[in-house]
């Protein structure tokens, strides 16, 4: 039975978003967060540490380690990319920024492939709008282009994308290769070599980026969907053979990437079933709601309005393909320890599904989205500006007191460049809002302009006005500086209990030679860094006959990241006896005031 297509779009509604505006939005979203910041705790910093170990030659390229510790995520490609960038960068480029450059391109690649993937899904004959009796419906190419604009806007609007998409971690690499695979499968009916290469590259990249099990499920399921795709009623024998060959090729690429993952020891089935407790499920529900907002309600509406095309004897690729990728990621989110980073991979497919809701939205629903977005992001921008003013002037007093409580000892600094960029972004937001509430012919993508623009505005304001505060609270830089100040002659330093982010920070920003502590005390390092107990006391595992506590060094914003510094007895006896001291977060500022 043939059911009516729910998409009714005129040619006027299929006009495309101006290219300059779309590119400006993408650059405004992508660049902040990669520029002008330190590596943040702890996954971002730990990944940088593994890359630095590869550059120094102290780790195997096939099995990256950090002072002998393996990676938490069974990945190699993200660390290779960062290490190669650090090796190729000129000396005047800082190593941590050089490591971010390939990840900036990965984010851009995810944006481009999400746009093209949505475009080719919209070119599907079953996705095209209903033809009018006297003409005037949207042309296929124009309709697909407008839908792709909406898909990219939905992708950028997702709240969970911002931070994880600007880290040098395997999560961003997995996102990019998922989007590449999504594009390859979406474009496969319309192109030959390009989409096939993209699908193979996506599967291979996913496997080498720590997600080989997802690559297996993506590849097998998508190959079955492609084999059973009957977008048109006329399919000759040659077309059937071509579709079968392409499906077999996808399966072969899946097997090759799986074999490579097994050979490198990257395939680890780590399934953690959720416990039957409301607290756990409540956390998952909250994550799904805020992380994928505002795409998830639109995606649900798509599944409802296009349900006859989804549950039909004829495979509707434009709904079935993103729905399959979304289903795999949603299940993996429930069965993995890093739920947010797994859910990140669902965003390209989720954005495509959200785009197909746009031709079916009523005007009242579109207006509701606009007003909610306007109030939410305008309120966020106002709050960011008020807190920044409080950091600079102390007025209003309550936000200034909150900053002092959360980041003791933080001293605000003023940057004309950051202020100018933030001001221009805020003015641009006002202009976009004025344009959106004005009277003009509505294109199908207009409902997502404010969500995407608001997400970009909030992220850009965070990365300009609040960057000094975020660096102070989210990095290990100050902790490393205070630790180095306590070392008379920073030779090698033994460690016990430190997180991988801390280890990487002490090695990368502190130039310390860290080694794991020898249980029998046979090491020759004069210093020892230890993770303190929850009450900041010394752990019982430290041999007081070998080590003498020298200082407790507090992280400026998180006491859980503090460290205890010990001196070996043989080195301590040669110095004057001193009582252990606590290095407070505002110690430097207090001494300056005195």
Mark where each language-model region is:
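Specific aromatic-rich, kink-prone transmembrane helix
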Residues: 160, 174-190, 350-353
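Short acidic/glycine- and proline-prone juxtamembrane loop motifs at membrane-interface regions
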Residues: 160-173, 212-214
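Extracytosolic helix-loop segments that constitute the early lumenal/periplasmic catalytic or substrate-binding loops
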Residues: 47-73, 77-80, 84-87
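Transmembrane-helix motifs of polytopic, lipid-linked glycan transferases
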Residues: 101-139, 156-157, 180
């Amino acid at each position: 039975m043939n059911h009516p297509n729910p998409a009714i779009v005129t040619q006027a509604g299929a006009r495309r978003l101006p290219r300059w505006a779309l590119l400006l939005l993408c650059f405004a979203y992508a660049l902040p967060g990669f520029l002008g910041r330190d590596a943040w705790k702890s996954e971002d910093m730990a990944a940088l540490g593994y890359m630095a170990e590869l550059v120094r030659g102290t780790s195997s390229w096939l099995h990256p380690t950090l002072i002998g510790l393996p990676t938490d995520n069974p990945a190699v490609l993200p660390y290779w990319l960062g290490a190669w960038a650090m090796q190729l960068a000129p000396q005047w480029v800082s190593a941590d920024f050089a490591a971010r450059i390939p990840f900036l391109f990965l984010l851009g690649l995810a944006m481009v492939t999400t746009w093209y993937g949505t475009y080719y899904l919209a070119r599907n004959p079953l996705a095209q709008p209903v033809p009018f009796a006297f003409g005037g419906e949207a042309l296929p190419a124009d309709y697909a282009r407008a839908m792709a604009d909406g898909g990219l806007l939905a992708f950028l609007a997702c709240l969970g994308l911002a931070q994880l998409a600007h880290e040098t971690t395997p999560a961003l690499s997995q996102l990019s290769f998922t989007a590449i695979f999504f594009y390859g499968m979406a474009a496969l009916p319309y192109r030959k070599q390009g989409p096939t290469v993209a699908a193979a590259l996506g599967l291979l990249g996913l496997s080498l980026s720590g997600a080989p099990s997802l690559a297996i499920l993506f590849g097998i399921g998508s190959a079955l969907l492609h084999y059973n795709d009957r977008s048109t009623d006329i399919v000759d024998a040659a077309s059937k053979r071509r579709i079968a060959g392409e499906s077999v090729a996808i399966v072969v690429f899946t097997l090759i990437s799986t074999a490579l993952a097994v050979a490198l020891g990257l395939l680890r089935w780590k399934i953690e079933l959720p416990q039957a407790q409301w607290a756990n499920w409540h956390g998952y529900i909250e994550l799904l709601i805020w992380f994928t907002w505002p795409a998830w309600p639109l995606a649900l509406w798509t599944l409802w309005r296009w349900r006859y095309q989804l549950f039909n004897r004829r495979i509707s690729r434009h709904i079935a393909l993103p729905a399959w990728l979304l289903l795999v990621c949603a299940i993996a989110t429930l069965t993995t320890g890093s739920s947010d980073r797994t859910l990140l991979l669902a965003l390209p497919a989720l954005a495509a599904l959200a785009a197909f809701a746009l031709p079916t939205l009523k005007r009242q629903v579109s207006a509701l989205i606009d007003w909610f977005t306007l109030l939410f992001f305008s309120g966020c921008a106002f709050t960011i500006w008020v807190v920044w003013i409080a950091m600079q002037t102390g007025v209003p007093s309550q936000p200034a007191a909150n900053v002092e409580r959360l980041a003791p000892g933080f001293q605000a600094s003023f940057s004309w460049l950051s202020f100018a960029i933030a001001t221009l972004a805020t003015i641009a937001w006002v202009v976009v809002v004025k344009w959106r509430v004005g009277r003009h012919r509505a294109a199908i993508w207009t409902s997502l302009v404010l969500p995407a623009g608001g997400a970009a505005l909030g992220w850009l304001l965070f990365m300009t006005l609040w960057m000094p505060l975020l660096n102070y609270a989210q990095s290990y830089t100050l902790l490393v500086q205070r630790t180095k100040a306590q070392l008379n002659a920073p030779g090698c330093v033994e460690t016990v209990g430190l997180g991988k982010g801390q280890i990487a920070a002490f090695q990368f920003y502190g130039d310390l030679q860290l080694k794991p502590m020898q249980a029998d005390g046979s090491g020759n390092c004069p210093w020892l860094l230890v993770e303190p107990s929850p009450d900041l006391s010394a752990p019982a595992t430290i041999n007081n006959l070998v080590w003498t506590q020298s200082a407790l060094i507090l992280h400026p914003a998180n006491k859980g990241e503090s460290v205890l510094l010990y001196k070996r007895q043989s080195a301590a006896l040669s110095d004057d006896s001193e009582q252990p001291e606590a290095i407070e977060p505002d110690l430097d500022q207090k001494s300056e005031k005195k």
